[in-house]
From Swiss-Prot:
The keyword DNA damage is annotated on this UniProt entry: no
One Pfam family in the UniProt entry: GTP_cyclohydroI
Cited function: Involved in serotonin and dopamine biosynthesis that affects movement, mating behavior, foraging behavior, and cell migration.
Organism: Caenorhabditis elegans
Residues involved in Zn(2+) binding: 113, 116, 184
Catalytic activity: GTP + H2O = 7,8-dihydroneopterin 3'-triphosphate + formate + H(+)
Highest taxon of source: Eukaryota
Ranges for region Disordered: 1-28
Protein name listed in UniProt: GTP cyclohydrolase 1
Length: 223
């Protein structure tokens, strides 16, 4: 029998940080010797330049504090670069003799497209089959947050979440599906308001066993 949760509770902890080499370089920049205040100041100057180059008056009342606000917002949008997986899990990995599917679905996700720096948002569904260890359920949502709060593409985000789950609890299998709407397709370019993108990453038994994969997909689509 499968277990379905909608973002609550607890699971497991065994990991190091994951991601591409580019991710690690960016994390080093944010966690390194450059003070946060210096990052913020440089970003404020950059936003001031952008506002001026679109033809606006930087001294107009409504724009006086916009560079600072925008810089602080961007720092928040990309705070995932400051996170490390082992710290995020915080020992929430538990020994448990459970070998049936665990699913946390409809995890809300917001990220920034690395190509245009505009948002994409949607829902993440994660399933895994434990191998003697389970992870605190809320940690699945935190893993999503860690990787979505970076400059991303949906395909890589999907894989990073799945890989983090493998590092966290070494399960028999992991499945991740993301359904998202991209503002780069809505606000510019083809301007298709109702278009959505679905990506998946299936590892272990979810990749090897069609019946297990089908069970997961049926359960996340059940309302």
């Amino acid at each position: 029998m499968s277990r379905i949760e909608n973002e609550s509770g607890f699971l497991s902890s065994d990991a190091a940080s994951v991601g591409s080499e580019d991710d690690k370089v960016e994390m080093k920049k944010r966690n390194g010797t450059i003070p946060k205040e210096d990052h913020l100041k440089s970003m404020c100057n950059a936003y001031q330049s952008i506002i001026q180059h679109v033809g606006e008056d930087i001294n107009r009342q409504g724009l006086l504090k916009t560079p600072e606000r925008a810089a602080k917002a961007m720092m928040a949008f990309t705070k995932g670069y400051d996170d490390q997986l082992d710290e995020l899990l915080n020992e929430a990995v538990f020994d448990e003799d459970h070998d049936e599917m665990v699913i946390v679905k409809d995890i809300e996700m917001f990220s920034l497209c690395e190509h245009h720096l505009v948002p994409f948002m949607g829902k993440v569904h994660i399933g895994y089959i434990p191998n003697k260890k389970v992870l605190g359920l809320s940690k699945l949502a935190r893993i999503v947050e860690m990787f979505s709060r970076r400059l991303q593409v949906q395909e890589r985000l999907t894989k990073q979440i799945a890989t983090a789950m493998v590092q966290a609890v070494q399960p028999s299998g992991v499945a991740v599906v993301i359904e998202a709407s991209h503002m780069c397709m809505v606000m510019r370019g083809v301007q298709k308001i109702n278009a959505s993108t679905t990506t998946s990453c299936m590892l272990g038994v979810f990749r090897d066993d069609p019946k297990t994969r089908e069970e997961f997909l049926n359960l996340i689509n059940k309302r």
